Design a protein with these regions (language model features):
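Proline-centered linker/hinge motifs at extracellular inter-domain junctions
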Residues: 1, 174, 270-274
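Long, low-complexity serine/threonine/glycine- and acidic-rich segments characteristic of extracellular
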Residues: 7-153, 253, 266, 294-304
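Predominantly extracellular/luminal regions of secreted and cell-surface proteins
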Residues: 171-193
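Proteolytic-maturation and junctional protease-sensitive modules
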Residues: 185, 211-264, 293-295, 299-304
Length: 304
């Protein structure tokens, strides 16, 4: 269960009980919030080409369709948009996907046949929510929830806390500057209001929040005072891994666009490329070599 307020989300796990092989039920929910629902589910014989698992997700309020995904087909540009319906914070923490059955009414998407920004539950209102999960062969599973418009009978989970100093409204553009390091964020880069840490400390530029995902590129300009052989910019990711970003300096900056937040710093490539000959000669009598560089990649191959 999600609470939707002022562009932010809070959630709490609901306990459900099995009624029969195809139907589950939850205890009555008392609330006066704007709410939404999310599910963790999968299909053992999934025949759909999507990141969600099931073929169709439907949500009804008092038997009226409120929201529906249908994965008959979708265009290639819609593939990244599917991620908007996944709880990214939960995925980072648990490596499991909650599919959100609410979204943005402004998007006209082929795989969304009915869209809603959530359910507004008013004082004294009573409603029955039915969530229907369907596989490709039209086998269905149902979840029934009863809503009462009253004071909440539950508490949302606490937010995951991390250091932050900027709150971003997705409807605004931002240009931040910290000691010459620049961050340029366009409108609608993030799906909802998001907190990030933008700071520079111990030779590291922080553009960081492990629990949010950018929907489109933002621009970073990393100020550099000197250029040494083997020098390049890298990004430290939330899981501790490092990713090569750039080794090109222009007008005193590493300037690049990315969707990935992280901690950016200068590193040095001290490992020479590896060249390995394939042991056997193929049927065309060709000799093959494998060329690998684990840090910055291969820039030029010269053969004599």
């Amino acid at each position: 269960l999600y609470g939707i307020k002022n562009g932010t989300l809070k959630k709490v796990k609901l306990d459900i009980s099995k009624i029969n092989d195809s139907t589950y039920i939850s205890k009555s929910i008392s609330t006066r919030d704007t709410i939404g629902f999310g599910v963790i589910t999968y299909d053992r014989q999934n025949l759909t080409n999507n990141i969600f698992g099931n073929h169709k997700y439907s949500l009804f309020k008092n038997d009226t369709l409120n929201f529906e995904f249908t994965f008959d087909s979708f265009s290639f540009p819609e593939k990244p948009i599917q991620k908007r319906f996944v709880d990214y914070e939960f995925f980072v923490l648990n490596k499991s996907r909650i599919i959100k059955l609410f979204g943005n009414n402004e998007n006209e998407l082929r795989f969304v046949s009915k869209n809603s920004n959530g359910l507004i539950i008013r004082e004294g209102e009573k409603a029955t929510i039915k969530i229907k999960l369907s596989d490709y062969d039209k086998n269905n599973t149902y979840l029934i929830l009863n809503l009462i418009g009253d004071e909440n009978n539950y508490n949302y989970d606490s937010d995951n806390i991390f250091p932050s100093n900027k709150i971003l409204d997705p409807q605004k553009k931002y240009l931040f500057d910290f000691n010459g390091h620049k961050l340029n964020i366009d409108k609608n880069t993030f799906l909802r209001k998001s907190k990030i840490l933008f700071d520079y400390e111990n030779d590291t530029l922080f553009v960081f929040n492990p629990y949010v995902e950018a929907m489109k590129n933002f621009e970073v300009k990393f100020l550099i005072n000197r250029d040494l052989d083997g020098q390049y910019l890298t990004r430290k990711n939330h899981d501790g891994s490092s990713t090569f970003v750039s080794n090109k300096i222009s007008n005193g900056y590493y300037s690049f666009k990315t969707k990935s937040l992280g901690k950016f710093y200068v590193d040095y490539d001290t490992i020479t490329p590896e060249i390995k000959r394939r042991k056997r000669v193929d049927y065309k009598k060709q000799i093959e070599y494998y060329i690998l560089d684990k840090e910055t990649g291969i820039k030029i191959i010269w053969v004599k």
